[in-house]
């Protein structure tokens, strides 16, 4: 088992890591947090020659794109053991990346795709069915789980674990070799024939015999709704709101729930379509593969049925309840001949619309737009503050093209920094600047995180730049974790997901591919960062210049420190925590500090001076004491309104005495 983390499925790898010692190892199951999706997909190669089951996971189409080389080879050669790919379908309102469908990837490589109903019990069943389907058709199988389903909570009934016949505890004794499983001509031609003559027909038989898709008959026999299994909850909820379904999903409208959306089973779908006049396809995203296939099947079978889909909903975007209810209403009103039914549906829809208007009127103002931002104390923020200060103070040097990358640091493209002219993929920032760099009259900057560096950046970025003698600057943000996915381990962490030491560092890797100009800077030292960036951009030395900005992810740091601090405070030990503030009598309300910082803990409050109308800066209680606000004010030569205090828990006698003396002196010098 393995995979690469990415929302919305990252926590699955956390669960596997937590279960490694207590469950996986005793069963002889191997687990790894892979270096990339391609490495994870290659794990499934074990199932090509041996009856070994394997499961991997990653994020959406972007993960599948990275994995596609290895995955296409596995799908071509075929598998003996069940091979399951669990994909977090990152599509819609909560998505963090490209809006594309796994369905297209499944069609490209002839990989069966499961999209089951979004219930925990259904997921448990279809994991088992997924392995069975894979072994029945000798192909890997995609198992798609949507964003909201990835965050469900609940209970389910499980069955006992079955110890695998081949495992780390029952190892193989001899290798298996067959030229027919090597992806080389002429065997690739035979593999292609097997896909369509044997494997996909076997998949259809399994889907039909095991009843993976669900047909729910209804009294309105002339109508029908075909949907992806993952949209069952939303569709039935929409029917319920229109008065056409109860809370258990019983409805007079016949339903076909496609838990397996590729390959489709023609006889199953034709059996549903026969005798119907109007059928609606509820399919999220484009291209509308299901709608097209259904129309083609009906046309070839010469069925007199009108099939609709996207014209009732939207050609793009997530099918949220409001959109689905509206689409169902349009379809049912146009398809139902009885005036009584139409009136009832329209009345329910009008009541829903009126309720939304009441809610909208209850909100005095629209919810404020809040762009994504760095966390409080994030070590990546000061790096972009330094870039912005350099660009402002010395535009002839600092005002240059910046190739951004995937990660937390992508937020640099947002206000207040607006640093980053392009984002092309994970670890691809440096490679994306290869064509831009020769066209500029100054050096360009590329940015990547340590996660992106180890994933793709070292080979496709750094090695490519060295090979092509690129003269530019690379900034690597080394925060010791793949933080954007949830602080997962990478080689910079020092240990892997199994807590084993790695012995890998970014400087070692850079020197290994020939980089000689390497500078390491504390992320929070803004003046030094500005100076180092200026040196990298102006030095006469040709070739790639790398600036490594080191600073631990603040979220992970606080998770580690706060329990220790609470324990020490409870034990009566003295604990000192730095905090920063803004002197309200000094701050003029200029807000330059915010325009160069953007810290969530740095906010606004009313000025105590009645002659100053503008609100002043204020540091709230979420401050973690990183000091970036003061560093920015100093480096940018801003106002001197920032101050640092120390919050002391369980102060000793000497500390209390000094505090009393200070208060006495201050009171004498500045009487009330």
What annotation goes with each model-predicted range?
Residues 21-33, 76-88, 167-175, 467-480, ...:
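A glycine-rich helix N-cap at a beta->alpha junction
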């Amino acid at each position: 088992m393995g995979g690469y983390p990415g929302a919305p499925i990252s926590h699955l790898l956390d669960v596997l890591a937590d279960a490694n010692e207590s469950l996986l190892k005793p069963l002889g199951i191997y687990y790894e947090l892979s270096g990339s999706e391609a490495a994870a997909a290659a794990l499934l190669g074990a199932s090509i020659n041996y009856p070994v089951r394997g499961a991997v996971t990653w994020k959406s189409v972007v993960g599948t794109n990275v994995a596609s080389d290895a995955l296409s080879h596995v799908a071509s050669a075929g598998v003996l053991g069940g091979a399951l790919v669990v994909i977090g379908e990152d599509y819609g309102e909560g998505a963090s990346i490209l809006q594309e469908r796994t369905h297209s990837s499944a069609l490209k490589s002839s990989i069966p795709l499961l999209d089951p109903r979004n219930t925990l019990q259904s997921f448990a069943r279809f994991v088992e069915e997924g392995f069975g389907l894979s072994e029945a058709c000798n192909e890997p199988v995609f198992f798609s789980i949507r964003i909201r389903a990835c965050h469900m909570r609940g209970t389910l009934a499980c069955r006992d674990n079955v110890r695998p016949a081949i495992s780390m505890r029952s190892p193989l004794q001899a290798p298996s070799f067959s030229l027919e499983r090597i992806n080389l001509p002429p065997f690739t031609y035979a593999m292609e024939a097997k896909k369509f003559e044997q494997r996909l027909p076997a998949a259809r038989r399994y889907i039909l015999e095991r009843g993976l898709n669900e047909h729910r008959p209804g009294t309105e026999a002339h109508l029908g709704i075909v949907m992806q299994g993952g949209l069952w909850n939303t569709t039935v909820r929409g029917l319920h709101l229109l008065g056409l379904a109860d809370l258990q999903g019983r409805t007079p409208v016949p339903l076909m729930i496609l838990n397996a959306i590729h390959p489709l089973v023609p006889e199953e779908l034709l059996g549903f379509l026969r005798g119907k006049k109007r059928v609606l396809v509820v399919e999220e995203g484009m291209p509308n593969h299901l709608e097209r296939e259904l129309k083609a099947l009906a046309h070839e079978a010469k069925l007199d049925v009108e099939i609709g889909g996207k014209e009732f909903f939207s050609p793009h975007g997530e099918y949220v309840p409001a959109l689905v209810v509206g689409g169902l209403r349009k379809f049912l009103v146009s398809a139902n001949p009885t005036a009584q039914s139409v009136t009832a549906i329209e009345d329910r829809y009008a009541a829903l619309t009126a309720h939304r208007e009441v809610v909208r009127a209850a909100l005095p103002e629209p919810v404020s737009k809040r762009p994504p931002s760095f966390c409080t104390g994030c070590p990546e923020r000061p790096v972009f503050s330094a870039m912005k200060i350099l660009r402002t103070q010395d535009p002839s040097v600092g005002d240059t093209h910046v190739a951004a990358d995937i990660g937390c640091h992508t937020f640099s493209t947002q206000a207040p920094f607006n640093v980053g002219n392009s984002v092309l993929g994970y670890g691809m920032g440096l490679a994306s600047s290869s064509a831009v760099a020769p066209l500029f009259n100054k050096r360009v900057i590329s940015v990547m995180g340590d996660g992106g560096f180890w994933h793709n950046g070292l080979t496709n970025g750094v090695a490519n730049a060295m090979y092509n003698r690129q003269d530019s600057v690379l900034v690597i943000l080394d925060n010791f974790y793949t933080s954007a996915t949830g602080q997962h381990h990478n080689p910079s962490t020092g240990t892997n997901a199994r807590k084993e030491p790695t012995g890998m560092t970014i400087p070692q890797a850079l020197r290994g591919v020939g980089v000689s100009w390497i500078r390491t800077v504390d992320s929070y030292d803004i003046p030094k960062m500005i100076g180092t960036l200026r040196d990298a951009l102006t030095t006469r030395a040709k070739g790639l210049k790398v600036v490594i900005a080191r600073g631990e992810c603040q979220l992970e740091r606080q998770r580690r420190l706060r329990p220790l601090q609470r324990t020490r405070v409870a034990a009566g030990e003295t604990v000192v925590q730095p905090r920063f503030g803004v002197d309200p009598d000094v701050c003029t309300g200029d807000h330059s500090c915010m325009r160069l910082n953007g810290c969530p803990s740095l906010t606004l409050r009313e000025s105590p001076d009645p002659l100053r109308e503008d609100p002043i800066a204020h540091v709230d209680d979420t401050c973690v004491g990183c000091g970036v606000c003061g560093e920015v004010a100093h480096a940018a030569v801003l106002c001197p309104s920032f101050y640092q205090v120390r919050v002391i828990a369980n102060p000793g006698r000497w500390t209390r005495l000094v505090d009393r003396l200070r208060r006495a002196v201050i009171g004498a010098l500045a009487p009330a």
